[in-house]
Amino acid sequence: MGFNDMGIRFHKKPFEFHKGWVLVHGDEGSMNTNAGLTALGLARKFGKSVVCGHTHRAGISAFTEGIGASYRTLWGLEAGNVMDKKKASYLKAGSANWQMSVAVIETHGDRVSPMLVPINKDGSFTLYGRLYA
């Protein structure tokens, strides 16, 4: 796919890119039809927050466990896609529950803030208050 040409390292196994956060392809567990819940299922399986692709859906979900001041929150983020759905000839009837978006992960020391950037049908999106069209 030309990853090397783009300076992208492909990891075949889950990759911890920040303490407590794992990047995975998304096919390591059970698929859920609700956006964000495949990633959250993987987060609960791995015991770390997860960012994944593969599902082509855009969603973020969280699960918190613990009691009182002793708790943790796991995040599951599915990054969506940037594909041309018209070229997905394998789709029956050309229909799929897929959303166009990209994920942005901001870190400040140990703090991590995941977010989704929805991409409009015309390919435009807004990030940090600026419209890209």
Please annotate each region the language model reported.
Residues 13-14:
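Gly/Pro-rich turn-and-neighbor structural signature
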Residues 1-10:
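Active-site neighborhood of divalent metal-dependent phosphoester bond hydrolases
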Residues 17:
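Catalytic cofactor-binding cores of redox enzymes
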Residues 20-117:
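Conserved beta-sheet core of the metallophosphoesterase superfamily
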Residues 107-133:
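A short C-terminal boundary segment appended to hydrolase-like catalytic domains
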